[in-house]
């Protein structure tokens, strides 16, 4: 029992059929009880001229992250794992963003950037804009779930929890931006709702210096979940025959 991987166990004690190499230990899951979460891969967060770039954050390294997310999505779809896409933002009038009575009004760097630089005439993170849209290289397909969210966590004021429970999903595999903000916030909230959370580290990117990426991943693997990578995810989802090494 002590040598068994981490992960959800059914009432009979059976763990999942797929074992993923991860830190701090391997974690097992069943593909039909797992979702791949793609967090906020919008122009706002991953493209020059988007919100993060305009707010002074470095987005120059997001290209390889987008490519690895595409690989993770392809592997998940091939294995029958549900793909869930999040888009962070608000209505065009910013009612959902909250006014001065909301901490979001004071802490959101998008809202602060627009107030500080009104001459830009930007509509950052507003639904229906280029900023809000997913990057061209990543597109949902039929069968995927696309959800908007008005705050960092994908569980806040969204139907995510009920959608997951209705489908018997217990394990959430995370990719996206930003590791230290929306990815970690959603994984933490999932942890408190009894979901097993895994981050594919090389398919995420931080908002801020690299030390924030390192700190977020260390925090997750120590307290809230597991950390793996795209190559390990792809390998774990290969049929047994494909994983065997010829003698």
UniProtKB/Swiss-Prot annotation:
GO terms for molecular function: hydrolase activity, acting on carbon-nitrogen (but not peptide) bonds, in linear amides. It comes from the Bacteria. It is an enzyme of class 3 (hydrolase). GO terms for biological process: nitrogen utilization; uracil catabolic process. Keywords: Hydrolase. The keyword Hydrolase applies. The keyword Metal-binding does not apply. InterPro entries: Isochorismatase-like_dom, Isochorismatase-like_hydrls, Isochorismatase-like_sf, RutB. NCBIfam families: RutB. This is Ureidoacrylate amidohydrolase RutB. The gene is rutB.
